[in-house]
C-alpha cells in the first residue's frame, strides 16, 4: 500500500477518542510516528494513558492525554476544544472509543443498551460535529466500526452490531455534509483483532479463527497502518466508505 516515508503528517494535529489501549494506542503512536501531534481521550487508567504519551514523546513526538468519558457529550466537546487550545488546530479525528456488551436477549439491560448507543454512536456524532467546527480543507475523520455490522456469528451481540451498523449510515450522511468543505470521513471495520479486550486465544477466539480465510486475528498495528493511509493526502478521494480489514471474516 504505502510505507512510512510516503505518509507525511507533519504539522497535522489529531484527536483520538479512546487512545490509551489496543487499537487506539496503536493509532496514536502510528500517527505520531508520521509527524502528527496527537491528543487522545481515555476513561480509566491514568498510568496506561501516561505510558502512551511517554512512548510518543520518547520517539520525538508530541502527545496529550485527556481524561474524558465518551458517554459524556460535554466531556468529549471539551477534550476536542482542549486539543485545539493546546496545539492550535485540528486536522484529524479518529473515533475509536467503543464498548462491547454481550448478553442473551432476555438478560440484556436497558442500561447496557443505552450506554452502547451513547459511546458507539452518539459520541461519534458529537465528536464529528465538534471537530468539523475546526477543520479546514484536507480534514480527515475516521470512525472505527466493526465487521459485525455485516456479520454476527455469535449470539448476544445484536445491540453491538446495531451500533456499528449505524456508523455505516452516519459515515455516508456526513460525507455529504463535509465533502463540499474538502473534509473526508470514512468508516474502518476491523475484524477480530488481538487486544487485551479481545485476546486471540481461548475457545471463543478459536471459533472465530475457524471461519476466517487467514485463520488468525489481526494486529492492532495493521489497523493503525490502514488508518494512517486513510488520513494521509494520498487518500483524498476516499470518503463515505466503510472499509473492512478483517482477514476475510466477512467473506
What is the role of each PLM region?
Residues 128, 163, 171:
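Active-site helix of classical SDR
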Residues 13, 20-21:
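Conserved glycine-rich cofactor-binding loop
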Residues 34-51:
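Conserved glycine-rich Rossmann-like NAD(P)H-binding loop of the short-chain dehydrogenase/reductase
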Residues 104-105, 112-114, 208:
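Substrate-binding pocket helix/loop in short-chain dehydrogenase/reductase
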Residues 2-5, 151, 228, 239-251:
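Short C-terminal tail/terminal secondary-structure segment
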Residues 133, 176-180, 236:
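Alpha-helical segment proximal to the catalytic Tyr-Lys
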Residues 212-223, 234:
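A conserved structural motif in NAD(P)-dependent oxidoreductases
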